[in-house]
Amino acid sequence: LKCNKLIPIAYKTCPEGKNLCYKMMLASKKMVPVKRGCINVCPKNSALVKYVCCSTDRCN
């Protein structure tokens, strides 16, 4: 699985066991991504942070 880094023109290959790509955004009107990468379990959203997870190459 290949996941985008913070700047989507760059990506990395995920290590074994991390089979989801994620995008973390501050929960505001703009929803600008502040972090991207590989993860094994999609975190729950909170009042301040929203996560979007997916399982295909460079989907984040």
Swiss-Prot record:
Highest taxon in the source lineage: Eukaryota
UniProt xrefs under InterPro entries: Cytotoxin_Cobra, Snake_3FTx, Snake_toxin-like_sf, Snake_toxin_con_site, Toxin_cobra-type
Tissue-specific expression: Expressed by the venom gland.
GO CC list: extracellular region; membrane; other organism cell membrane
BP GO terms, sorted: killing of cells of another organism
Alphabetic keyword roster: Cardiotoxin, Cytolysis, Disulfide bond, Membrane, Secreted, Target cell membrane, Target membrane, Toxin
Disulfide-bonded cysteines: C3-C21, C14-C38, C42-C53, C54-C59
Major localization listed first in the record, in broad terms: secreted
Compartment(s) where it occurs, according to its Swiss-Prot or TrEMBL record: Secreted; Target cell membrane
GO MF term list: toxin activity
PROSITE patterns reported for this sequence: SNAKE_TOXIN
A matching Pfam family: Toxin_cobra-type
Statement: the UniProt record of this protein carries the keyword Transit peptide: no
Record's function text: Shows cytolytic activity on many different cells by forming pore in lipid membranes. In vivo, increases heart rate or kills the animal by cardiac arrest. In addition, it binds to heparin with high affinity, interacts with Kv channel-interacting protein 1 (KCNIP1) in a calcium-independent manner, and binds to integrin alpha-V/beta-3 (ITGAV/ITGB3) with moderate affinity.
Subunit structure and binding partners: Monomer in solution; Homodimer and oligomer in the presence of negatively charged lipids forming a pore with a size ranging between 20 and 30 Angstroms.
Family note: Belongs to the three-finger toxin family. Short-chain subfamily. Type IA cytotoxin sub-subfamily.
Protein name, UniProt field: Cytotoxin 4
Lineage: Eukaryota, Metazoa, Chordata, Craniata, Vertebrata
